[in-house]
Structures are given as structure tokens and as C-alpha cells.
Amino acid sequence: MSRIRQAFAALDGGKALIPYITVGDPDIRTTLALMHGMVANGADILELGVPFSDPMADGPVIQRAAERALANGISLRDVLDVVRKFRETDTQTPVVLMGYLNPVHKMGYREFAQEAAKAGVDGVLTVDSPVETIDPLYRELKDNGVDCIFLIAPTTTEDRIKTIAELAGGFVYYVSLKGVTGAASLDTDEVSRKIEYLHQYIDIPIGVGFGISNAESARKIGRVAEAVIVGSRIVKEIENNAGNEAAVVGALVKELKDAVR
């Protein structure tokens, strides 16, 4: 059983908290400290952003984080090194990479999949890879035991949902809002209806992200989805608390986890 499946099974019907940070923001040492701190405060799965120069799906908060990481020279290989170092002391917590196809394409799908598996990556989500064209990367990930994680948006067609249901591993990431990460208004009733609809086709957990910024919104989403994904709020706390990132983010993660139990 994969680490992601084990993580959901261990919750025994409880809901997973999946926090997101950008690797290398503000630096590699802090990234590792944040990863361990988030796990210590209740994170069930970690989502690591791979910095990219044109993060079209991300709002201004995560865009700035990517810019800071790129200014530090962070590459995809550095991201894999971070996971490798994390695995030296944590072999249980699943790690998912979230990013864009270009850096993966540059490395080569086979080499990336092999190196990701060796480093201890459990899942990969490339936000700009339509399900219709992802087959070459999907095959390499599958051959190396790494889950291919897909986004589903409010506008995703039924045919595409069916295709994703056949291919997806780990969990499916439902984008609760149209637009970019960090967007504001969240209609939990609409999300609930959509999750119920998606589970007609999808039999693995569904995580909801975009627009979840506090314990109250996390609690509401936790009532209807198997996982709650929080990114922009955490990245904003990192941006606003230089030198004290791990403590502030740890406290926020604990608050969020307490809300979704």
C-alpha cells in the first residue's frame, strides 16, 4: 500500500490536512524545518511547490514565493534533494510535488520519475498537463510507483472526469473556485454538491483546495471532502514572519488540523 493510501487509511474516516509550501522560500533549511514542523503539528500529507517562472495557476502570494525561491537558485533537482533529506528522518509522511510541466520536461520524464521515486516522492501534480496529453509522464510515474494526481475544476466535463477517474492515484485535487490560488469567496454548499457528484465516478479520496484560509473554512470543507488543502494562507504567513516561519506556520497547521478532525 502506498504512503498516501496508508495516510488516509490511518485516519479511519477522519479528514486529512494537506498544507502547501514552496520549496526554497525563504531558503532550503527553513523549508525542511517547516516540513517537519507541519508534520509535528498534524499535517497528514505535505504538498511541495516546485518553483517556476510562469506559475499561471497561482495567485500573487504563491507567485512571490516562487520568485523568492528562484532568486535563491532553486531547481527541480533541489526540490528532490529536499525530499531526500526529509526522508532521512521521516519515512511515513507522504510528499506530493505540485508544479508545472516545463521543469519536468527539461529533466526528462523517465529520469524525473526515477529520481522522484528514489528521493521518496509519493505523488506528482503538474497543473498545466491536460489529462489528454499526460500519458508519457503518467506511464513513467506509474512504472516507478509514484501516484499521478489530477486537478478537477468546477468546469471539468463529465468525459474528462471519467478519464481522470481511471488514471488518478493517491487523491484527486478539486479546485473549489474558478481562478487562481488565494481567491476569496468559497461556497461550501456548492462544493458539497460537487464532491457528491464526483464520487459517482471517483473512488479515491478527494481533496479540496483554493479559497481555504482559516479554521472555519477548513472545518466546513472537512465536512464534505476527504482532505483539506491549504496553500496561500500558509505561504503568506511565511512571507510575513521572516525568522519565525516554523513557529507561526506550525501554530496555524495545528489550528487547521484541529478544525478538520
Curated annotation (Swiss-Prot):
Tetramer of two alpha and two beta chains. The keyword Magnesium does not apply. It comes from the Bacteria. The active site is at E47, D58. One of its GO terms (molecular function) is tryptophan synthase activity. Keywords: Amino-acid biosynthesis, Aromatic amino acid biosynthesis, Lyase, Tryptophan biosynthesis. Belongs to the TrpA family. This is Tryptophan synthase alpha chain. It catalyses: (1S,2R)-1-C-(indol-3-yl)glycerol 3-phosphate + L-serine = D-glyceraldehyde 3-phosphate + L-tryptophan + H2O. The lineage of its organism: Bacteria, Pseudomonadati, Pseudomonadota, Betaproteobacteria, Neisseriales. The alpha subunit is responsible for the aldol cleavage of indoleglycerol phosphate to indole and glyceraldehyde 3-phosphate. GO terms for cellular component: cytosol. Pfam families: Trp_syntA. Pathway: Amino-acid biosynthesis; L-tryptophan biosynthesis; L-tryptophan from chorismate: step 5/5. Its EC number is 4.2.1.20. SUPFAM superfamilies: Ribulose-phoshate binding barrel. InterPro entries: Aldolase_TIM, RibuloseP-bd_barrel, Trp_synthase_alpha_AS, Trp_synthase_suA. PANTHER family: TRYPTOPHAN SYNTHASE ALPHA CHAIN, CHLOROPLASTIC (PTHR43406:SF1), TRYPTOPHAN SYNTHASE, ALPHA CHAIN (PTHR43406). It comes from Neisseria meningitidis serogroup A / serotype 4A (strain DSM 15465 / Z2491). It is an enzyme of class 4 (lyase).
